[in-house]
Design a protein with these regions (language model features):
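N-terminal single-pass transmembrane signal-anchor helix
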Residues: 2-29
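Short, well-structured alpha-helical interface segments that form or flank functional binding sites
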Residues: 3, 43, 47, 195, ...
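Sec-dependent signal peptide cleavage junction
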Residues: 25-37, 441-442, 455
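Membrane-proximal N-terminal amphipathic helix
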Residues: 34-62
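Long, domain-scale functional regions
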Residues: 63-96, 100-102, 108-109, 122-455
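Flexible, surface-exposed loop regions and adjacent strand-edge segments
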Residues: 112-113
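Intrinsically disordered, low-complexity regions of secreted protein precursors
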Residues: 116-120
Length: 455
C-alpha cells in the first residue's frame, strides 16, 4: 500500500484550525492571568485595609495615624512590590487608602470613614496613578534613617543627613531634626510657606509639623520679625508667662492667663498683618508649652526659685516635649490645651532647642542658629524662647539663644531679663493634612506645600 503524505491544502487547513483555536484560547488565558493578578492585588488592598486599625491600636497610646511602606509600617504580610499609604482617625477608622504595585492602583478617600465593603474589586485601576504625599509623609521618604538620642549634655555635632530623631510627646512618637548644618552635611529641613522661609523643628503629637521663622531669605542674618521684650515688666514671676494672671500670690494665680504678654501681642500683630491668609493650613491643636512648673525651690514672690526647664536643661540635661499643666499648653483649640491663643503661632521652646543640639552656655552653632551660608541667622541679636528660666530679686528671666556677638558660645542657650529686647522668631505648625508640592528640604530647593488641596 502506497503511503500518502499531507497535501499542501490539508496542511493549510490544519494551520488555520490551530490558529482559530489559539485565537479563542489565548485571549482567555491572558484574561484569566490578568484577572488572577488583579485579584491578588485586590487581596493585598484588603490586607492593608484590615491591618490599619489593628496596627493603630497595637501601638503604645495609639500614636501614629499615618502608615506607609516608607514611614511607619503596618503589621501586614503583602507583596514586596506594593507601595501603600493609609490614614486612620483616633478611633482607628480608615479615612484614606492608596495602594499600587505599578500595574494596578487602588485609591479611596472619605472623611467620614471607609468600611471594608467600600473596598471593591471593580474600583481597582489598571496602571499606576500618582498619589499626593503629605509633607509629613515626604519627610519620612526623604529621611529614611530614624534614630534616637540619650545624651543631651554636650552639643550634638553628629552627621545627621537624611536622618530624623525620635522622641515622644505625651506618649506619642514625634520626630525632630538635630545637629550642625555644614556644606558637606546639610540638614534638609527648609520650608517655604506663606511668603517666608522656615526651618522644620519637629513633628507634633497631633501629626502637624512645627516650623521656625527664617525671614525672606535662606541667607538672612535678620531672621526675626523684630525685637520685643518678653514682658514690659520684670518685677513679678508671672511675667515669664506668654499670658499671665492679674495676681501672683500663688503659681496658680500667676498662670490664669487673663492678660497677653508683650511678646504675644507683638507676634499676634505680625500674624494679623502677614499670615491670616494661611490660617487654614496651620494646626489649632498643636501645643506650645510655656512651662511654668517649679523645678528647684518653692514658688514665691520674695525668694528665689528655678523653673522646671532650668532643672531639665541646666542640671539634669534631660529635655522633654511633654507639657504637664493645661494652663501652660498654649493652643487655639481648647480641646487640646488652654485654648488661649488668638492665632496658631507662638515660639520655639528651650527644650526644642536642646533636642536640636543646643546646650546651656556652650558653643552650639546648630541648624537653628545658622543660615544657608552657615552664619548666624540673626546676626548679633539674641532671640527669645518660650521657656521660663528663674525668679530672683525682683527679676524674672526666660531662656533665649545667643547671637554671634557671644564668640565663645554662639547658638547656645542663655537667659535674659524678661524686659530685655530680644529678637522674635515665631513658630507655627503645618497641619498633618498639608500636601507636599515640591522640593527636597535643602536651602536651594525648600519644601513647598500645595495651596489648593489637602486641608
Amino acid at each position: 500500500m502506497n503511503k500518502k503524505g499531507f497535501t499542501l491544502i490539508e496542511i493549510i487547513v490544519v494551520i488555520a484550525l490551530l490558529g482559530a483555536i489559539m485565537l479563542l484560547v489565548v485571549p482567555n488565558i491572558t484574561k484569566n492571568f490578568k484577572e488572577s493578578k488583579k485579584r491578588l492585588f485586590y487581596d493585598n488592598v484588603l490586607g492593608i485595609y484590615s491591618s490599619a486599625s489593628r496596627t493603630y491600636f497595637s501601638q503604645d497610646n495609639a500614636s501614629n495615624k499615618s502608615f506607609s511602606n516608607t514611614g511607619v509600617k503596618l503589621d501586614v504580610d503583602i507583596s514586596d512590590d506594593i507601595t501603600y499609604r493609609v490614614k486612620v482617625d483616633s478611633y482607628g477608622v480608615v479615612l484614606s487608602i492608596y495602594v499600587t504595585d505599578g500595574t494596578y492602583t487602588y485609591k479611596l478617600d472619605n472623611a467620614n470613614g471607609i468600611s471594608k465593603k467600600d473596598i471593591k474589586l471593580a474600583n481597582v485601576i489598571e496602571g499606576k496613578v500618582d498619589d499626593y504625599l503629605t509633607l509629613y509623609e515626604q519627610l519620612f521618604k526623604d529621611n529614611p534613617t530614624i534614630s534616637t538620642r540619650t545624651d543631651f549634655s554636650t552639643p550634638f555635632t553628629t552627621n545627621t543627613v537624611n536622618t530624623l530623631y525620635k522622641a515622644t510627646e505625651n506618649g506619642t512618637d514625634v520626630y525632630y531634626f538635630a545637629g550642625q548644618d555644614t556644606a558637606s552635611t546639610p540638614i534638609n529641613n527648609w520650608v517655604k510657606f506663606g511668603g517666608f522661609y522656615w526651618r522644620i523643628i519637629r513633628t507634633n503629637a497631633d501629626g502637624s509639623i512645627r516650623l521656625l521663622y527664617h525671614g525672606t531669605s535662606t541667607t538672612a542674618t535678620d531672621a526675626y520679625i523684630g525685637k520685643s521684650a518678653f514682658n514690659a515688666s520684670k518685677d513679678s514671676p508671672k511675667y515669664v508667662g506668654y499670658m499671665y494672671g492679674d495676681t501672683d500670690a500663688t503659681l496658680e494665680e500667676a498662670r490664669t492667663n487673663t492678660k497677653d504678654s508683650t511678646i504675644k501681642a507683638y507676634i499676634d500683630n505680625w500674624y494679623a498683618n502677614n499670615m491670616t491668609s494661611y490660617t487654614k493650613y496651620l494646626s489649632t491643636t498643636a501645643v506650645y508649652c510655656n512651662d511654668r512648673e517649679v523645678g528647684s525651690g518653692t514658688y514665691s514672690t520674695t525668694t528665689p526659685f528655678y523653673y522646671a526647664a532650668y532643672t531639665r536643661l541646666d542640671t539634669n540635661k534631660t529635655p522633654t516635649y511633654d507639657c504637664t499643666n493645661n494652663n501652660d499648653k498654649f493652643t487655639v483649640d481648647a480641646s487640646a490645651g488652654n485654648g488661649k491663643l488668638t492665632y496658631p503661632i507662638a515660639l520655639m521652646t528651650a527644650d526644642e532647642i536642646a533636642y536640636a543640639g543646643g546646650v546651656n552656655s556652650t558653643n552650639a552653632p546648630m541648624w537653628y542658629y545658622t543660615n544657608s551660608s552657615f552664619e548666624s541667622s540673626t546676626g548679633t541679636t539674641y532671640w527669645w524662647s518660650l521657656s521660663p528660666y528663674f525668679w530672683h530679686g525682683d527679676n524674672a528671666r526666660s531662656w533665649d539663644v545667643n547671637g554671634s556677638d557671644n564668640p565663645d558660645n554662639p547658638g547656645s542657650l542663655d537667659y535674659s531679663l524678661v524686659n530685655y529686647s530680644d529678637g522674635v522668631r515665631p513658630a507655627v505648625s503645618l497641619k498633618s493634612c498639608t500636601l507636599y508640592s515640591t522640593g527636597n528640604g535643602t536651602a536651594s530647593s525648600p519644601y513647598e506645600v500645595q495651596m489648593d488641596g489637602g486641608c
